[in-house]
From Swiss-Prot:
SUPFAM superfamilies: L35p-like (SSF143034). Gene3D superfamilies: 4.10.410.60. This is Large ribosomal subunit protein bL35. It comes from the Bacteria. GO terms for biological process: translation. Transmembrane segments: none annotated. GO terms for molecular function: structural constituent of ribosome. Belongs to the bacterial ribosomal protein bL35 family. Residues 1-26 are annotated as: Disordered.
Length: 65
């Protein structure tokens, strides 16, 4: 069986944590920021985790991560 290919777009966007979960950046932080409060923008700087529902899909995209 041939090697599985890593989805390069996904590999650039996700990192694996020590416990094996996938870390991601939050959306809505690139433009149209004037109407968002400082608190909202500050919270968007923090990283998020991939939901359990999406983790199965991500494991297929990132077999070696």
């Amino acid at each position: 069986m041939p090697k599985m290919k890593t989805h390069r777009g996904a590999a650039k966007r996700f990192k694996k944590t020590g416990s094996g979960k996938l870390k991601r950046a939050k959306a809505f932080k690139s433009h149209i920021l004037t109407k968002k409060s400082s608190k909202t923008k500050r919270n968007l700087r923090k990283s998020g985790l991939v939901s359990e529902a999406q983790e199965k899909v991500m494991k297929k995209l990132l077999p070696y991560l």
